[in-house]
């Protein structure tokens, strides 16, 4: 018989970035430690995860179906739309290193002038690799996804209008973890491991 408690709903979520090699939390309830930056509010669409595989099929003479398959590679993507405009999101969206940005402080004047951030972008900007953490939250239920090394593989269009926030749609692609570890680690609360 089904159990409604096993239905997981992503009521809210958080996403964090840090330099590659930053220590991940050791449990789903542990706080994100030093070095992790909260990327702020996300669109109500939540997070979209996609998994893909590229397989080789071995055919045998006289057989209609493949007799064996082998996975050549697996990949995943995590798409999130962020609502806040922060230096970290500008870096990820425009592929700009923090060291290539300049923050000019506000001037009280006269004349007064606001603080502003300046940077340039080029067509061949280097990718920005980062460690990525995602929490999907429903009350005390948490699914925590920890990606040791991720790159932004796709960016949605930015719309500026009076009807909506000027958001940042980013698709993150996990890359091979440093030192050969797991590319993606997960903690999921309240899921029982069934033994045969």
Annotated model-derived regions:
Residues 1-196:
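Signature of extracytoplasmic/envelope-associated structural regions
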């Amino acid at each position: 018989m089904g159990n409604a408690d096993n239905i997981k709903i992503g009521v809210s979520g958080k996403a964090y970035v840090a330099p590659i090699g930053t220590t991940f939390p050791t449990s789903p309830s542990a706080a994100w430690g030093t070095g992790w930056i909260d990327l702020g509010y996300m669109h109500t669409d939540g997070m979209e995860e996609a998994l893909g595989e590229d397989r080789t099929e071995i055919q045998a003479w006289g057989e209609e179906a493949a007799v064996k398959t082998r996975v050549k590679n697996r990949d995943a993507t995590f798409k999130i739309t962020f609502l806040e405009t922060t230096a970290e999101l500008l870096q990820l969206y425009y592929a700009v290193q923090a060291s290539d940005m300049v923050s000019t402080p506000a001037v009280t004047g006269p004349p007064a002038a606001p603080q502003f951030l300046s940077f340039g972008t080029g067509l061949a900007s280097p990718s920005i690799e980062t460690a990525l953490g995602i929490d999907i939250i429903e009350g005390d239920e948490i699914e925590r996804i920890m990606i040791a090394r991720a790159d932004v593989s796709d960016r949605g269009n930015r719309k500026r209008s009076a009807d909506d926030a000027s958001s940042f749609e980013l698709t993150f692609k996990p890359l091979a973890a440093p030192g050969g570890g797991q590319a993606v680690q997960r903690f999921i609360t309240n899921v029982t491991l069934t033994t045969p």
